[in-house]
Design a protein with these regions (language model features):
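Core helices of alpha-solenoid repeat scaffolds
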Residues: 2-3, 31, 135-136, 168, ...
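Terminal, non-catalytic domain-edge segments
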Residues: 1-4, 424, 443-450
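Long C-terminal tail modules that include membrane-anchoring/sorting signals and adjacent low-complexity
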Residues: 318, 397-398
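Structural detector for internal amphipathic alpha-helices that build alpha-solenoid repeat scaffolds
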Residues: 17-29, 40, 44-65, 75, ...
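N-terminal "cap/leader" segments of large eukaryotic alpha-helical scaffolds
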Residues: 1-21
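Buried hydrophobic core positions in alpha-solenoid tandem helical repeats
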Residues: 6, 34-39, 73-77, 104-111, ...
Length: 450
């Protein structure tokens, strides 16, 4: 493996990078690359992947000189960082701490104290830094030290709220849930009730959390108790069409509609879609058919998929991907030939795949040096619904070049479904950056060894 190949594999979180470090004698030649990625956020989508902190620490440990990394990681962690990088460094330092490095403990404690002192004084809370979320993570980490440490965190929160004069400086609800899971709901609730009697700040925080939870429940109950008519959808679609990202404005109404809509309601909505003249409004109405078959002839939807209006084209393809029809297969092949993977047409093959499509997909996939997340997802959907031994070159390329480690886990499952998951790939997956993939690989290896 060249340094460039190692760098690409490490950035993507592939187990092959860890195996390479174990294999080569002069693995310190890779130390600059490992350090660079420790100090740089390399997560693609942390909401589904988490961070690659544990994975990077695995690489650091193999190099047999972790102290060389620890000081630089601590220096970086001590600065004011945006949330994603801070979480990655936090996860690495937690691994150091678990292995007994006191300097890592001190760095985590210092960050906790810095945020404890700074958060009450800020005029506003920048979403780039998400420092209240960072403080949450540090409080959750401290739970491992025992109930007395949790109690101290509650005292600290009381002081922060008193200093600021309101509860804006902390979140705490997730920390409270974690504490209940660890120490028991009865014990935690008893202590919080006791603190509410002693501290007006803590009582104010608890009351605020309870009011927020009550408001959330009332909102959900009200949202799903309302019956949304087609006329109401049309009215809101026209209002949403003027926004920069209009489809997000319709998500709530889609949930409300599908909860109670009858077949007659869907039929009425379908005719409304066909009659609508404005393409953006038409698209917003069409998106209500979320995993629900369009009840009329799909010929107009096929035409919409070729529209110059990007939103209408995109949503038409999303609706058509759940329909099995020869015309949709032909459309997918046509769009892939004309626009390639940028056409979002791969998803149409989930229900309309044919063996001959492997060659079409392979020729497009191997041209891409970096496979985008939506392509990874579509490939995984196709080959977990259909079995093809000739799909291995496609799946291998997407596995090695995909940008999302969560989607890579689904690619590995597709390999298994198609019976092309090799022992070499399975061994790599044991060291993958995504925890679910590591677990899946270990489970398969254990099953195969019986």
């Amino acid at each position: 493996m060249t340094k460039k190949e190692f760098s690409q594999a490490l950035r993507r979180g592939l187990g092959s990078a860890i195996i390479e470090l174990k294999r080569v004698q002069n693995n310190m030649d890779y130390s600059d690359i490992v350090l660079r990625y420790c100090l740089r956020d390399i997560a693609h989508d942390p909401q589904v992947e988490g961070t690659k902190g544990y994975y990077l620490y695995s690489a650091v440990k193999i190099l047999n000189n972790p102290e060389m990394f620890l000081g630089k990681i601590i220096d970086r962690f001590g600065k004011r960082l945006y949330w994603r990088l801070s979480e990655q460094l936090y996860d690495i330092l937690c691994c150091f701490s678990d292995d007994g490095y006191k300097d890592a403990d001190d760095a985590l404690e210092k960050k906790y104290n810095d945020l404890k002192n700074r958060l009450p004084t800020l005029l506003k809370y920048n979403l780039v830094f998400c420092e209240r979320e960072q403080f949450d993570s540090l409080m959750i980490r401290k739970l491992s030290s025992g109930f007395s440490t949790f109690k101290q965190s509650v005292y600290d929160i009381g002081e922060m709220i008193t200093k600021r004069g309101n509860v804006d400086c902390v979140f705490f609800d997730f920390v409270l849930d974690c504490a209940k899971d660890k120490f028991g709901e009865k014990r935690v609730n008893g202590f919080i009730s006791e603190m509410c009697e002693k501290s007006t700040a803590i009582k104010f925080l608890v009351d605020t959390l309870e009011e927020s939870e009550l408001s959330r429940r009332e909102y959900q109950e009200n949202m799903f108790s309302e019956s949304v008519t087609v006329e109401y959808l049309l009215q809101n679609a026209r209002a949403a069409a003027s926004y920069e990202y209009p489809r997000f404005k319709m998500l709530r109404y889609r949930l409300m509609f599908v909860k109670k809509a009858s077949d007659e309601d869907y039929m009425k909505l379908a005719y409304t879609v066909l009659r609508e003249k404005d393409d953006t409004v038409k698209a917003l109405l069409l998106m209500i058919f979320w995993r629900k078959p369009f009840p009329l002839d799909i010929t107009p939807l096929i035409e919409y998929s070729k529209s110059d209006n990007a939103l209408l084209s995109e949503i038409a393809l999303e609706v058509l991907k759940y329909v099995k029809d020869k015309r949709i297969h032909d459309l997918a092949v046509q769009l892939l030939a004309e626009k390639g993977l940028d056409s979002f047409a791969l998803g149409l093959l989930m229900k309309n795949y044919r063996k001959a499509d492997d060659d079409i997909i392979r020729k497009l996939i191997v041209k891409t040096s970096n496979v985008l997340q939506h392509v990874q997802s579509d490939i995984a959907d196709i080959y977990t619904h259909h079995r093809s031994e000739t799909a291995f070159p496609i799946l291998l390329h997407v596995y090695q070049r995909g940008e999302c480690s969560h989607c890579r886990g689904n690619i590995v499952r597709a390999m298994s479904h198609c019976k092309v998951l090799s022992n070499e790939i399975l061994e790599e997956c044991v060291y993958d950056s995504f925890e679910d993939t590591r677990r899946y690989a270990k489970r398969l290896i254990a099953r195969n060894s019986k």
